[in-house]
């Protein structure tokens, strides 16, 4: 254990990369059952939709709040059976990295850490609402990040091409 501490101290003294979880917390949780009692008296197989977003802000030098926003909706016949919205957040200390590496860490490692907490909170609130368990599939945040970067680059190229044809 002291060897690990010595390595961490040496990394910090040398200005090496640093990443630490300071706190994980539930920032907001909302649960709705728009169908009311109908949700429990009729037989149906709802369609589950999952929407995901990541927000981050720098709280102070080297300290970032990362919020995983997750919305899970169950629908049947275009009617919402239930709706769960959660903001699972964490404070992360990040140092010794440049801008692009920090952005990647915030959009991949941080949500990867937060997701199991959000998934458990969603499952728990659905259980309390008398719904069956919902096992959300794992999310590959690295792939989501790469896809978002690719889409942003394509959009920038499209806008640049449109700007050149106008001039």
Swiss-Prot record:
Gene Ontology terms: biological process: protein folding; protein tetramerization; protein transport
Pfam family, one: SecB
GO molecular function: unfolded protein binding
InterPro entries on file: SecB, SecB-like_sf
Location relative to the cell: Cytoplasm
Source domain of life: Bacteria
HAMAP family found in the cross-reference section: SecB
Family: Belongs to the SecB family.
Protein name (database record): Protein-export protein SecB
